[in-house]
Every structure is written in C-alpha cells, then in structure tokens.
Amino acid sequence: MTRKLFATLVLVAGVMLMARVQAQPPGSPHETAKATVGGATISVEYGRPYMRGRKIMGSLVPYGQVWRTGADAATTLTTSKALAIGGATVPAGKVTLYTLPAEAGWKLIINKQTGQWGTEYDQAQDLARVDLTKKALSAPVDQLTIAIEPAGDGGVLKISWESTELSVPFTVK
C-alpha cells in the first residue's frame, strides 16, 4: 500500500513540475539580421531580449560596463568580404560584437574571439573599438533589434532598444 501511495505522489509531483516548467514565459528569442551589400553577405546573430517593463539603458545595460549586445551567447557578425566599420578593418569571417555603453557616447567592440557565452569577454582579443552614433527615438522599441541597412557599397549597422538607436557606417573592401 505504501509503495502505491509513494508512486502516486511521485507521479503527481512530476506532472505538477512539468506544468510549472511549461508555464514559464519564453526566454529571449534568437534572430539573424542578414543583408547582401557590395557583393558581401553579412549577417549578425543575436539574442533579442524584451524590455518587459524594465529600465534598460543605464540599468539592465549599465553604463561603463562591456555588454554582450543581446542575450545569451555573444552576438556575432559574419561577413564574406572584409569590411571597414567606423574606420576599423574587419577581415572576412566571424567576429563577436560587444558594446561599451555610456550616457554620452557608446563604443562598438569588435572582438576576434568567437563561440563564447556573452559574458566571457576577453579585451586582449579586441580587433577594434569604434564610436557609435547615439540617437533618441520618439517611440520605444520593446525588443532589441539589430539591422543591416545597405547603401551603395556599404551601409549602416543599427542597434535599437528602449528609446535609443545606435549606428555605425560600414563599407565593403
């Protein structure tokens, strides 16, 4: 009798645990922004966190600390041809993108190390740090969005979230 009771309790606990796990809100979805620019195929893979009622700039994304520029794994940029991003040369292949937030001006960090979790930043692997142009948005962006906007033999890489848009021009070499 006690074995049947124990088995029933284990079964009920298991069902309740599964229901609780399934009821949790989804984490940050992952996205790939893609474009063909000047004969180069360019993509940015990143996690897209939501605001979920939180203050983002200066709080969830603190000023003065390197940020993974997304959620979960580090954000990566892959290009089939070399690029000039904000004056820095980025070779064909894959690099990791971090940002250094500041109230006045942000930096885009282009890092040679790839495949790491977003918080595993190694400054010794930096390829370059370039200035980002910061613009206030009139309407908030609820979910982090990265876009590649082609223009001639180059374009603009844009990062938008909350009421902030960051951008940097690039050209295909």
Identify the residue ranges that each predicted region occupies.
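Targeting-peptide/extracellular-domain and disordered-appendage signature
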Residues: T2, A19-P91, T96-K173
